[in-house]
Amino acid sequence: MTPQQRPGPPAPPPSVTRESAPVSLTDPRTPVAPEPAARWERPALVALLLVTAALYLWSLSSSGYANQFYSAAVQAGSESWKAFFFGSSDAANSITVDKPPAALWPMALSVRLFGLSSWAILVPEALMGVAAVGVLHGAVRRRFGAGAGLLAGGALAVTPVAALMFRFNNPDALLCLLMVGAVACVLRALADGRTKWLVLAGVCFGLGFLTKTLQAWLILPPLAVVYACCAPVALRRRFGQLLLAGLAIVVSAGWWVALVELWPAASRPYIGGSQHNGFLELTFGYNGFGRITGNETGSVGGGGGRPGGGGWGETGITRLFSSDMGGQISWLLPAALILLVTGVTVLWRARRAVATEQAGHRAVATEQAGHRAVATEQADHQVVAAEQAGQRAEFLVWGGALLMTFTTFSFMSGIFHQYYNIALAPYIAALVGMGAALLWRRGGRPAAYVLAGTVAVTAGWSFVLLNRSPDWLPWLRWTVAALGLLAALGLLLPIRASRRVAVLAAGLGVVTALAGPVAYTLDTVNTPKGGSIITAGPTVQGGMGGPGGGFPGGRMGGRNGGLPGAGQGGAAGQALPPGQGGQGRMPGGTQGANPPPQQAGKQGQFPAPGARGRQAGRPGLPGGRGGFGERGAGRMGGLLNGSKVSDRAKALLEKDADDYTWAAAAIGSQNAASYQLATEKPVMAIGGFNGSDPSPTLARFKEYVADGKIHYFIAGGQGGPGGGRGGSSQITSWVAKTFQKVTVGDATFYDLTRKG
């Protein structure tokens, strides 16, 4: 045979690209690792982060001190390193907040650097939101491409409850960032089997525990199981790595717990939220299993698991889709669940298809030993199989985290606020980005059917959510429904008809899915938030907005945590930093059409979707949220929201304040926080947040007074159920009988240095 007659080398197997999409969902010719970064990817990521930063930083100071309970602890930590370490409510270290202090540390450092202001307190929270979006983008992009990462990051950024909490000073912002970081580290460990990633994940979980105790460990079981089953290392090494990760959790969380438990109780602040001055009691009781069972001694509304969740909404599988929860988090939840099931199913079946083809290649290789083309194709299939295994593991990780958190939140009977749902936001966003990218890259009719169905379901659910606020942007729900129908039909067109049509339909589908959340988020950004119970978006029909059913007054009135008749700007409104007026309220708790002109931060705001004079819910009206009805206001006013401190009251407390350990004492942390933030002097919070903690006892309080450590007692405020083992109610009675009353405007003080 002449050289010209000899057959040439076999042609290489066709490369797998996004354009050469397989025709079935289980085709083993799946696109593998994402292509190298295109020129548009980095600018797109920068744009996403800049838009997120602008959204979260815009008019940030309009919320004043937000949750004064935590702001007072931040102020204390900026004045005292001991208060910083323990998370004390005041710089004199009488009692701590009812959480570990990690979430307070970034804010306290910011206040030390920039001085006390709303901006200094809230900027770290906003930056945490930007960081969470960036980390989520990177975690999703690694296996599913830049488009998936951008979609996931964007979905997280505009989730209403995420925008709410990344502009607020509750611990949930830091917890969300740490959980995204923990999952990202576990995914890196699943990709390369390196121990350092699991150790870093353990550190994130440990710091999460120091942020919000056991909630940080909700997703530990599914992540550990997935790693134990899917890690690319030997089984024995997997368990060794998991043990090291567990050790990292213990060390990163345990150092603080050990110091607190070993520290002499007499020389540290009382552990707020506990009944016996113990952090472990707080962890496993009030903040732990009590949240599941409803048996929370010392909590708002008393202990005892009430059927159906008592004052915190009905429990059950539909809880997060209900009127007062749905608009916070559930916009993309149906899509995430559909894409989770589809992604796992597709990748599992593709695994079997790849295994079958590999077996066939091995048989051919045996017959044609040394044939280069067969060996090359077999190696390509091994690469595809490995990539599909990695993608499958990522679906299991994000899906496991979502299902574990969703199930817990749906059925827990204890305290449950709408803003807790931020924990679900990154898991939902990741699954939407991953699932959409997986189906888009595979192409074919089955993928088109699933994508079209997902868009249609999302548009339909968005219509339902928007219809719960019928007078707010009434055109939006119909627009979303129409665009969703067009997008679904466009995705069903044969791809050969026009690829441009398919791309346009996909873009339209993204717009449809995000239109509702974006509108809710813009409304949230344009509405000042304050108090202990806050929600995102406009008022809704049938929403409770908080534990209305569990307290006198029933329905909730007022959307920003203010009490009807005692709203921000009134006598019992929320204290704002210097230069900021409160948000006006009409008698009865109705929010005025326009806030007072002196309110800072209103200049240059985003256009508020549907902005108009609107009521925030009179007592008894469906949809009122954030504050209690009139009958509840008398009992709960100082418990959930702070007080407006007049200039005269501020001057009274500041006079000779340096001669005392505490300028004043008040029942409940919110009441004390208002005066502390106004004067920047320590104010003792008797009974902690609920006014029900036995700190201090009457005997101890008498000692403080006899030693000249407290100047004034602030009348008002409200102890929790039963007055907290008699402590706060006994102190109030003793003070009223013993000392001279001083009235300043609407506020009443007792001078503890002058007996009546």
Regions found by a protein language model. Give the residues of each.
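Sec/Tat-exported extracytoplasmic proteins
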Residues: S78-K82, A131, N287, M325, ...
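Short, structured coil segments at secondary-structure junctions
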Residues: A224, A678-K681, V735-T738
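Luminal/periplasmic acceptor-recognition loop/helix of membrane-associated glycosyltransferases
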Residues: R631-A672, T679-G719
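Extracytoplasmic/secreted cell-surface and envelope-processing proteins
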Residues: L218, R236, A673-Y675, P694-S695, ...
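Transmembrane helical bundles and short interhelical boundary loops of multi-pass, membrane-embedded
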Residues: R445-G545
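Disordered, low-complexity segments in secreted/periplasmic proteins that are enriched in proline
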Residues: S274-G278, L282, N287-T315, L320, ...
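Membrane-integral, polyisoprenol-dependent glycosyltransferases
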Residues: M1-T297, G303-R362, Q368-R372, Q378-A447, ...
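Solvent-exposed loop/turn segments at secondary-structure junctions
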Residues: A131, V161-A162, G290, V540, ...
